[in-house]
Design a protein with these regions (language model features):
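Alpha-helical transmembrane segments
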Residues: 13-27
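Membrane-interface helix-boundary motifs at transmembrane edges
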Residues: 8, 40-47, 76-88, 112-115, ...
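Hydrophobic, aromatic-rich membrane-embedded alpha-helical segments
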Residues: 25, 60-62, 156-179
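Membrane-helix interface segments in multi-pass membrane proteins
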Residues: 24-63, 99-131, 196
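Alpha-helical transmembrane segments with an aromatic anchor "belt"
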Residues: 68-101
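Membrane-water interface of transmembrane alpha-helices
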Residues: 62-77, 135-141, 174-175
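Feature detects long, helix-prone N-terminal segments enriched in hydrophobes
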Residues: 95, 100-104, 117-161, 174, ...
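Low-complexity, intrinsically disordered extramembrane tails and loops of integral membrane proteins
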Residues: 1-11, 40-44, 180-197
């Protein structure tokens, strides 16, 4: 695991909440202030707020997907190999929404001049939504698999799935479980390393 993943895995629930909600809140304030000042200057300048909005969305997506990548990679590494979900599509499903946000912003700016581009946006957008739901599925199922070490049904991991879907509430319940599993994983490694050789 690299340092970024360890940072997310060790972070307390309130730290993840403050990071993601704080970035969103500060970004929204910046966008609102810039849109008010742009409207006051001229209507043409109002269209330029797409850049700060896109930057805020990309930053928020980066942190959110980084948190999911950290959880998914860690949980997959501690699940029994026979129960482990395949990482290939999970990795793709993390990268695609992050890249899509830039494509969306570029096409959204262009859609005012060419409405036909909206036909391109919809399938790309729905696939990005599918990828986000797959990320929720992967992390929630891997969390329960890591905790109980036996095959699970949707009923078993529906709680974490919906809690992570409704992020502002779910982070308070999900992150402590991640912290516990991470601490359990690190404690045996530390005791083995501390043994005289």
């Amino acid at each position: 695991m690299d340092n970024v993943a360890n940072l997310f895995l060790r972070a307390k629930h309130w730290q993840i909440f403050v990071l993601l909600v704080g970035v969103g809140f500060v970004g929204d304030v910046v966008v609102i202030v810039s849109s008010i000042s742009a409207t006051a200057r001229s209507p043409e300048d109002f269209g330029k707020i797409g850049l700060p909005f896109g930057f805020v969305m990309a930053l928020l997506m980066f942190f959110f997907l980084g948190w999911f990548w950290s959880m998914g990679s860690f949980l997959s590494s501690i699940v029994q190999p026979s129960l482990r979900l395949k990482m290939g599509f999970f990795r793709f499903a993390l990268v695609y929404p992050g890249l899509y946000i830039f494509v969306f912003m570029a096409l959204f700016q262009s859609s005012t001049t060419n409405p036909a581009l909206l036909a391109v946006i919809f399938p790309l957008h729905f696939f990005a939504m599918f990828c986000m739901f797959y990320d929720l599925y992967f992390v929630s199922k891997s969390l329960v698999l890591a905790e109980i070490s036996k095959p699970v049904s949707f009923y078993d991991y529906a709680g974490p799935f919906f809690l992570m879907w409704f992020f502002p509430i779910g982070v308070w319940f999900t992150q402590p479980r991640i912290n516990r599993l991470y601490a359990e994983r690190k404690t045996p490694e530390l005791s083995i390393a501390a043994r005289p050789g």
